[in-house]
Amino acid sequence: MSRVLIIESSARQQDSVSRQLTQTFISQWKAAHPADQITVRDLAVNPVPHLDINLLGGWMKSAEQRNDSEQASLDRSNELTDELLAADVLVMAAPMYNFAIPSTLKAWLDHVLRAGVTFKYTETGPQGLLSGKRAYVLTARGGIYAGGPADHQEPYLRQVMGFIGINDVTFIHAEGMNLGGDFQEKGLNQANAKLSQVA
């Protein structure tokens, strides 16, 4: 049995294309791997606080030095990190907001990219500690940006995943969602075709 962790980050609910992609992924994954455990963390429904002084204090201070706010922030970070550590497969659903990822997803990443936990510093440079995991990134974009200079999603997330040791990363883009007509239909068809090959 494998454990799948899904991170939803779209602010939209019913009309969200990235959420539609997630549901397709879940349906196909369950059909192929009925025994697997799937956990969904919805950052729009339950937002993760952005990196602040309490979280930094929670990381850097000893248990005796932490105040209640710092301890609460550390506990939250530990919960999020433990979910990631336990997962064999990570799925991030990310609409493109202003050429990048939603700030809620960035906040989640800030909680789980932790020295000594998901990566470590060595004499030869940083080393990721999550090797052996797979990641899928499901994106929805109003325009067509893949491979171009305006795409600040894929390069950033590839860098982040590689930094923590996840090098097996598959991106599935639904592009042209705001262009209407044939563009939208083509974008969805291409994304769904790639999803059908995932499981």
Curated annotation (Swiss-Prot):
Any idea which UniProt keywords this protein has? Flavoprotein, FMN, NAD, Oxidoreductase
Cofactor note from UniProt? Binds 1 FMN per subunit.
Q: Which GO terms describe its molecular function?
A: electron transfer activity; FMN binding; oxidoreductase activity, acting on NAD(P)H as acceptor; oxidoreductase activity, acting on NAD(P)H, quinone or similar compound as acceptor
Which InterPro entries is this protein grouped with?
Answer: Flavodoxin_fold, Flavoprotein-like_sf, FMN-dep_NADH:Q_OxRdtase_AzoR1, NADH:quinone_OxRdtase_FMN_depd
Enzyme class, broadest EC rank: oxidoreductase
What EC designation does it have?
1.6.5.-, 1.7.1.17
Where does this protein hold FMN? S10, S16, V17, S18, M96, Y97, N98, F99
| Cofactors that this protein relies on | FMN
Pfam annotation, one family = Flavodoxin_2
Give the highest taxon in the source lineage.
Answer: Bacteria
Q: Which reaction does it catalyse?
A: 2 a quinone + NADH + H(+) = 2 a 1,4-benzosemiquinone + NAD(+); N,N-dimethyl-1,4-phenylenediamine + anthranilate + 2 NAD(+) = 2-(4-dimethylaminophenyl)diazenylbenzoate + 2 NADH + 2 H(+)
Q: Its biological function?
A: Quinone reductase that provides resistance to thiol-specific stress caused by electrophilic quinones. Also exhibits azoreductase activity. Catalyzes the reductive cleavage of the azo bond in aromatic azo compounds to the corresponding amines.
Subunit structure, per the record? Answer: Homodimer.
Task: Name the family.
Answer: Belongs to the azoreductase type 1 family.
Name of the molecule in the record: FMN-dependent NADH:quinone oxidoreductase 2
Its source organism is Pseudomonas fluorescens (strain Pf0-1)
